[in-house]
Regions:
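Conserved, mostly hydrophobic/aromatic
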Residues: 73, 106, 167, 218, ...
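N-terminal catalytic cores of secreted or lumenal carbohydrate-active enzymes
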Residues: 22, 36-216, 220, 254
Length: 477
């Protein structure tokens, strides 16, 4: 659906959590056919125990799990470029709908790129590119100038729409002159340039802070198991840099961690940033990679958490890692959901200890552009008509909203009856005391279920291929 005044109507409501009461349940639905878009339903009233014929979802707030940092997507160059192609009014409205907690779906954590990723229409670049054969150990030529065209203006506008918005950032490659093959595509960072690369991070964080964009956290490398220089087909070559767990451990322990501390920066380090498969397969290093880093006490002292992607393995890999390192936060930093089954996938991340969820690529045009990389993205949350420059929202936008508009920063996941991939759920207790339950029905059949809480129940009918969010007051924890 295109952005129109009518489309904004569902945003005109009180804060869902604060408006909840102890005697009733408010709830909202989005359906894959878009007949319902974060549409509020008639209020449900708690009843005494009812028939147990319908499947039950029981909530036990005394059993708790992770505390949430945030939920969001990415403001990578492709998304920023498409936002910049819109009219000023559409750009403001679209960002408001993405990040505003009151007038939008309330994304509060966004992934940025340090230099260029694959999803861009511009030539590949780092912040310290040099002619062949030259080096710059003191980083005298460091510059974020290329980000000033449209990336930084978009980020500033997003932060104006939500001052609580947090940004974390990932590089796809160090500058080519620092690497074994002297190119931004593939290869490895040479150890002699570890000190300079640590300062590269410091300069990036300071430069963005000077523009009013504080960087909450960084990862060392997007998908460090990948070396795209090894691809024979040039189509598959894009910025990348291969690291081992031991190399990243050395870099964090001896260089980046100390450099951030010397600079007086509070930016956090999230290690790994690759798939959650348990064992190494192909380009995927497996859990041995972050285990190597966190098993070194001096490196672990600088690490705030582990970042995972979802392109290989199973989300249960995050739970296995949590069992081994129970005090280390787990961040899901890249994945795409695509449709109602994506709602089940998002729940699986949250039920496997992720304290954050970030999708990847928020807005492409309806031709899948801009994109200089090899991966074709399915339809993004919002697409842009390249002729009219009008944005259109798709189901995934509303699906995200069913989670992100309701689950607050600082929410604690509470125990709820385990579902299945045909009927999934996850529950949280917000800092204001409200309980939030998200339920996904990816099947073609209407589902009836009973929600049980504190000796009372309500019965809910969830339409086919839809997601529901239920909110009620439970008092301050």
């Amino acid at each position: 659906m295109s952005l129109t005044a009518a489309a904004l109507a569902w945003f005109v409501l009180a804060s869902p959590a604060s408006a909840a009461t102890a005697d009733s349940v408010r709830w909202w639905i989005s359906s894959a056919d878009l007949k319902q878009q974060l549409a509020e339903q008639p209020v449900l009233t708690w009843q005494t125990e009812t028939s147990r014929k319908a499947p039950r979802i029981e909530i036990n707030p005394t059993v708790t799990f992770q505390t949430m940092l945030g939920l969001g997507s990415s403001l990578e160059p492709a998304t920023c470029s498409n936002l910049w192609r819109m009219s000023a009014a559409d750009r403001e409205r679209t960002l408001e709908r993405l990040v505003s907690p009151s007038a939008g779906i309330g994304m509060n954590l966004m992934r940025l790129c340090i230099g260029t990723p694959d999803f861009t229409g511009d030539p590949w670049y780092s912040y310290n590119d040099l002619p062949p054969g030259e080096t710059d150990p003191e980083l005298k030529h460091f510059s974020i100038e290329k980000d000033r065209t449209y990336i930084l203006p978009v980020l500033k506008l997003a932060r104006a729409k939500n001052p609580e918005l947090l940004f974390f950032a990932s590089p796809w490659s160090p500058p080519g002159w620092m690497k074994s093959n002297r190119t931004i595509i593939g290869g490895q960072l040479l150890p002699r340039w570890y000190p300079a690369y640590a300062e590269y991070f410091v300069k990036f964080i300071r430069a963005y802070a000077a523009e009013g964009i504080p960087i909450y956290a960084v990862t060392i490398q997007n998908e460090p198991g990948v070396d795209r220089a090894q691809e024979k087909n040039s189509k598959w070559q894009y910025p990348s840099c291969h690291w081992t767990g031991a190399q990243e451990c050395d870099f964090i322990r001896d260089h980046l961690g100390p450099a951030l501390r010397r600079a007086g920066l509070n930016t956090k380090i999230w290690c790994y940033d690759h798939n959650y498969n348990v064992k190494a397969t192909g380009d995927d290093p497996g859990l041995a990679y972050p285990r190597t880093i966190l098993s070194d006490p001096r490196a672990a002292a600088f690490v705030n958490g582990v970042a995972f992607h979802g392109y290989a393995g199973d989300p249960s890999g995050m739970s296995l890692f949590h069992q081994e390192f129970p005090t280390v936060p787990i961040y899901f930093t890249e994945g795409s959901i695509f449709g109602i089954k994506g709602g089940v996938k998002l729940i699986e991340k949250l039920r496997n200890h992720a304290v954050a969820y970030n999708g990847w690529v928020t807005i492409l045009d309806d031709q899948g552009k801009p994109n200089n990389g090899p991966f074709d993205a399915s339809r993004t949350l919002i697409t842009l008509d390249p002729k009219t420059r009008q944005p259109t929202e798709h189901f995934d936008f509303f699906l995200y909203g069913q989670f992100m508009k309701f689950i607050q920063r600082g929410a604690v996941r509470v125990n709820s009856t385990a579902g299945s991939r045909n009927f999934a759920n996850v529950a949280f207790r917000n800092p204001d005391g409200a309980i939030v339950l998200v339920v996904v029905n990816p099947t073609a059949q209407r589902k009836l279920f009973t929600l049980a809480w504190d000796g009372r129940t309500v019965t809910v009918a969830l339409t086919a291929r839809s997601v529901a969010t239920l909110v009620w007051a439970a008092g301050k924890p």
